[in-house]
Amino acid sequence: MKKMPRIMFVVLLSLSFLYSFPAEAAKPFKVPSSVASISKENTYPNASQDQPLLQPSELTAELFKTTSVPIENTHLIKMLNESSISGTPLAVGYRATIFLGRWALSYDSNETVANWEYKKVNTNHIDNRGGNKTVIGKYVQKQQVKVSGGLTAKVPNPEDVKTLMMQKAIQKTKLPLAFDTVIGAGTKRDQSYHVSPKKAASLHAYAPAINEKGKVTYGEVYLVLKGNKRKLVVKNVTSQGIGAWIPVQDHLTFGFQGMN
């Protein structure tokens, strides 16, 4: 059998790389069957945090194209959206540099995982040890409980960082998230739990939370005007690793534990 010429082999090998395998689709965030929404049953009306992303205006979008540093901070976008620059040609040689502040510009997510039993919020006991027929127990929230998350480290502009992280976590999990959520007293569910005679059981309820980890990017933002041209300049760009716990709003994880 004749050997394949080396040049032909290299060509064929190179051509094989032109065909790319289809990328594996991102798997949806899996929620266990033990987790249930209580948005309709909750006696405390939590305010929704799932706000639509603020879109840059025509001027803001034009300015963003002048810098290679990604900007996702909604407060900075809003400030630029509310600004206006006259279209009248400025004097030849005119130049101005306006310092807009040091901002948390963007957040890159590295890991998003859930703790479905982040905080125990309620326990209902069903004692049927003295009974001779099956009894039914249900979840009833005994008292109002506030569940809070937060950043795992101190960083500059913490509120902006929390907003950036929550936006990314909501996009990845498709869950309603908030750094503070409340389960109101008297909240109930219709689902029944059966306890046999001579038995007892406990129904535990937990508030789930998302653990978000990634990197936040900071930078000093300047608006530079020169003649009739305008651009954004970002200086002293730094990045910092950060994590956060973000509770899942109006959701509970239920655990039913039987005992003799």
Which residue ranges define each predicted feature?
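Solvent-exposed, conformationally flexible loop/turn segments
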Residues: 158, 197-200
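Deployable pore-forming modules of oligomeric membrane-permeabilizing proteins
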Residues: 26-152, 174-194, 201-202, 207-212, ...
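Detector for methionine-enriched segments
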Residues: 1-4, 8, 79, 165-166, ...
